[in-house]
């Protein structure tokens, strides 16, 4: 029964962000079809953050009307909406409308908003629901949350989403560039453009290398239907969790009952022994030495600030520039960084099950370390299209490793902070979810003008890129 519950909790946790993560990994294929092009990631970031109206409403209701708020119907609703929205995506993702000065993916943006509303609201409903289960299941929930990024990434990898190659493109003189190709290559040598001449010296045509996307193994329609199936599995898992014979609140009630019993017995045993020894009583309260990190108000404030900061980096700041930081090193580096960093998330959560460390100084140091890797990723994005060691194998290894370690370190921190707050109270988990969304919102609001308005980042075409040594 315990193994089945772990499996259900893991599947349930996967539903927290699987839909939005699926959109992100499908972006390399979507940007070639939608009119927004490579500005689509920053548009998505803003649309996703607008959906924070959902968690804001839930948090306000929890604060002012806690008695009228029940997570169960909200969770059923958001999972059902997510399943339907993913199914609609399969048929409407490429529908465009003429708005103001051009065509825009209005249907895509509207459906993205509903998916984001589902996933953002999960932060303030799924975690409080987990307080009804024994503490050992919370880490399993975070493993499932990590799988919400890994499984779509593996599907996108099987799809071949966004794989590119370099082709020779012939451009006749005094004409616009042609898409006709005269050959294919997989890397760039020498100059990126040559001119053909006849015997009289007249220029005939220009030949240069350009990136071309390879056909996907299956269409976005199939991909989004698979996403809808994943969401349906999450809905079924939550339904089965509700049908489990053991009441969800029993773990907490049993703990409180055992504490009352122990406290009521202690004075009788200690009538002739002086003041009661606090040792056994404190042990019965669930290892308070591990919970002291969240007992002091300053420590609690530090935890919430850390939650907001970590999620600002992982959900708002760095995702907006991943393409800029990786594509200059080539499509292989980009795909490895996206896929392996998605694998780092559940692996870090799984590691926390066997190597838990609740020390706030340790988590602070790990946050600084992860932030350092994030700073390297940001620096390479700023230096695009000619970052450090561009064109060298060491540069590719560094950028992939940096993204993996960035996600891995901060994912571990997020899990342990959630475990600390879970031991405090259900309300602490609600505010933890609010801090998650606040940090994500602030990160997105910071990056949107930098990417779309000021345009501080330059995209790179790996095939035609020439950087000075």
From Swiss-Prot:
Glycans are attached at residues 94, 168. The chain crosses the membrane at residues 7-27, 44-64, 72-92, 106-126, 138-158, 221-241, 298-318, 336-356, 362-382, 397-417, 428-448. The keyword Transcription regulation does not apply. Residues 1-6, 65-71, 127-137, 242-297, 357-361, 418-427 are cytoplasmic. Residues 28-43, 93-105, 159-220, 319-335, 383-396, 449-469 are extracellular. Residues 266-290 are annotated as: Disordered. Signal peptide: none annotated. The modification Phosphoserine is found at residue 251. It is found in: Cell membrane. This is Solute carrier family 52, riboflavin transporter, member 3. It comes from Ailuropoda melanoleuca.
